[in-house]
C-alpha cells in the first residue's frame, strides 16, 4: 500500500515524516491553499544532506505546463499531481515528456467515475477525493462504498478526510485497483504541520495491526 503524506512545508517536520514508513511526500504549489509552499525545501535543507527516501509529489491546480515542468526540474519532483481541470491532452503532453502523473477527481456519486475514462492511459494513478467547493482539503470523507462503481484500469489512491480512527476501515477496504492512501488534514497540528505521533500510530495500525494490538497474526490457509 502506498502511503502519501501531503501538504508538507516545514523542513524539520519533513525530516520527521520522511523517517516514517511512508512512500510519497506531497508539496502543494497552489497559492490559494492553506498549505501552499512558495519554495519547496530542497532535498539538502529537508534532510541534512541525506537522500529523501519518499518520492516527492508536486501538487498543482490549473498550472501551466511550463510552470509545472520548471518546478519539477527545480525540486526534482518524482510525480506531478494535477488537482484542477487539466485535460487529457495536458496529461498526454506531460506524459510524452517523461513525467509521472497523478490525476485527482472529486467524488460524490458513482456517476463521477465516468469522467475518469478519457484519462485512462494518460496518467499513472488516479486520486479520488471528496467533492467540495474548492480543490480538495475539505477534511471530509466520501462514501467509499460507491467505489464499487469504478471499473477502470488505472490504480487509485483514496483521499479526503482520512483520520486516525479510520485505520480499521482502510485495513478492511478492498478493490482490485486500490493502490494507497493520501493523508493530510486529519493528521495536522495546524495547516502544513503534521502530528508525528498520530501518523506513526496510524501507520503502525494499518501496516502491522497484529504487532500494534499485541495479537499474533492469523494463520493463512
UniProtKB/Swiss-Prot annotation:
**Pathway noted in the entry:** Amino-acid biosynthesis; L-tryptophan biosynthesis; L-tryptophan from chorismate: step 3/5
GO MF term list: phosphoribosylanthranilate isomerase activity
Could you tell me what this protein is called? N-(5'-phosphoribosyl)anthranilate isomerase
Q: Specify the species.
A: Parabacteroides distasonis (strain ATCC 8503 / DSM 20701 / CIP 104284 / JCM 5825 / NCTC 11152)
The organism's superkingdom is given as Bacteria
- Substrates-to-products reaction catalysed: N-(5-phospho-beta-D-ribosyl)anthranilate = 1-(2-carboxyphenylamino)-1-deoxy-D-ribulose 5-phosphate
Q: Which gene encodes it?
A: trpF
Q: EC number(s) of the enzyme?
A: 5.3.1.24
Family membership noted in the UniProt record: Belongs to the TrpF family.
Matching HAMAP family: PRAI (MF_00135)
Gene3D superfamilies tied to this protein: Aldolase class I
Amino acid at each position: 500500500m502506498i502511503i502519501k503524506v501531503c501538504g508538507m512545508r516545514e523542513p524539520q517536520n519533513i525530516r520527521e515524516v520522511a523517517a516514517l514508513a511512508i512512500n510519497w511526500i506531497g508539496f502543494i504549489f497552489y497559492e490559494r491553499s492553506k498549505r501552499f509552499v512558495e519554495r519547496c525545501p530542497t532535498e539538502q535543507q529537508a534532510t541534512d544532506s541525506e537522500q529523501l527516501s519518499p518520492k516527492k509529489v508536486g501538487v498543482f491546480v490549473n498550472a501551466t505546463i511550463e510552470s509545472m515542468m520548471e518546478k519539477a526540474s527545480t525540486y526534482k519532483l518524482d510525480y506531478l499531481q494535477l488537482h484542477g481541470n487539466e485535460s487529457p491532452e495536458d496529461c498526454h503532453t506531460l506524459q510524452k515528456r517523461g513525467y509521472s502523473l497523478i490525476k485527482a477527481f472529486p467524488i460524490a456519486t458513482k456517476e463521477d467515475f465516468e469522467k475518469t475514462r478519457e484519462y485512462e492511459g494518460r496518467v499513472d494513478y488516479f486520486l479520488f477525493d471528496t467533492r467540495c467547493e474548492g480543490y480538495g482539503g475539505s477534511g471530509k470523507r466520501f462514501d467509499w462504498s460507491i467505489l464499487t462503481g469504478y471499473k477502470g484500469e488505472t490504480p487509485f489512491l483514496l483521499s479526503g478526510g482520512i483520520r486516525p480512527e479510520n485505520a480499521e476501515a482502510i485495513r478492511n477496504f478492498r478493490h482490485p485497483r486500490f493502490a494507497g492512501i493520501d493523508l493530510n488534514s486529519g493528521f495536522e497540528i495546524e495547516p502544513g504541520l503534521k502530528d508525528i505521533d498520530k501518523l506513526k500510530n496510524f501507520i503502525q495500525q494499518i501496516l502491522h495491526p497484529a504487532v500494534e494490538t499485541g495479537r499474533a497474526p492469523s494463520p493463512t490457509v
